[in-house]
Amino acid sequence: MMGGEAMTQKNVDVLGLVTARFERSVAVPEAFFAEQAGRIAEACWAMARRFHQGGRLLAFGNGAWATDAQHVSVEFVHPVIVGKRALPALALTNDSAILSGLRVGSAGGVPFAHQLAVLARPQDIAMGLSPDGCCTNVVEALAEAQRLGLLTVGLAGGDGGPMARAGLDFCFVVETDDPLVIQETHETLYHVLWELVHVFFEHERLLR
């Protein structure tokens, strides 16, 4: 009986942790999207116009955010919703030979800026993803994208760091220090960006 009571107490504690985590995972994105809805709509329109002009999405980030760059790219190239058009997108984090080659002699991580200088066209979209906006190579790549005339979109967390002060066309900062909630919110955000870009494509007169 004593063991059963102890297990029950442990279960209650675990349930409390689960509930707290869920509440945080709901409250932060709810506040973020309530505040940023207008800017998100503007970003979607700007992205849709670039795609309409023949542009591509070029996404990049480090670590777990490197896989987010791949995730958002595949969403555009291979839409999960039947009937939505495929749009050109590329994650700069995909090619291991290029990444390892560029990393040699680089003290600041993978120089995404070099890839943009070689691959990007002025009508393209650069999307940089970072947990705190402080990833030097991501911020430098966005600066290179600005120099080249790309539409620049940054996704960050915390206070946004240097990314938030870089004068990007759009910078969306999830104001929490919890990296899990930041990533969850970023994922929802780029799903929304994908969906609304297609809404604008369904009303192409708005893109002229």
Residue ranges and their predicted role:
Residues 155-170:
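Short, glycine/polar-rich helix-capping loops at beta-to-alpha or helix-loop-helix junctions
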Residues 142-146:
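Surface-exposed amphipathic alpha-helices with a cationic face
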Residues 65-70, 134-141:
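Short glycine/serine/threonine-rich phosphate/pyrophosphate-binding segments
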Residues 118, 180-208:
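A charged, well-structured terminal subsegment
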Residues 45-120:
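Glycine-rich, small/polar surface segments that engage phosphate groups of diverse ligands
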Residues 1-34:
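Generic N-terminal amphipathic, Lys/Arg-enriched alpha-helix
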Residues 93, 130, 156, 172-180:
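Short beta->alpha connector loops at strand-helix junctions that form conserved
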